[in-house]
Amino acid sequence: MLNIPENQHNSIEIFTPDQVLENRGRVAIFIDGSNLFYAALQLGIEIDYTKLLCRLTAGSRLLRSFFYTGVDRTNEKQQGFLLWMRRNGYRVISKDLVQLPDGSKKANLDVEIAVDMMALVGSYDTAVLVSGDGDLAYAADSVSYRGARVEVVSLRSMTSDSLINVADRYVDLDQIKEEIQKTSKHHVSYNNFPVSVLDQDRSSR
């Protein structure tokens, strides 16, 4: 049995949240647009995507920020929003919505998110996943095993425990809503889009 001197136990260093953020290195952000949209609805806020990007980066070096969403190419408001996103720091990954038998529309981008997270391992030190979808837990865990830090940002009530369990850090959107909500009307409004033109695949529990 390994005997560790008592004074060595007392010398274990405890890092503050600020010190943890300082060690994030290069950051890559992966945003599940549909999941974030529904979280914002639950919180009763409108997301300011400039503030969101700043908050998620938190002063670290940003490699790239991906935004994944289903699209209706006939919806001019949504196209305008996505154009704004592309011009303001986001790489937009989109997929055409498919109409389901019940009349709703859906575009599942879990595969795209997982593939991009894995493909870029080695280029970033910290992956920030904005989603509560448990289907992404395996990809997040795989990224972690390959040496990257994983942070999950989502609304707790919409987040799978399996995703939280594989994360190095979890941030509840409810705790940072004051920092990321829109306070002016200068930007294109995401909440103006009808739910039918957005990916309606809610997070799995």
Outline where the language-model segments fall.
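Terminal and domain-boundary accessory regions
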Residues: 1-205
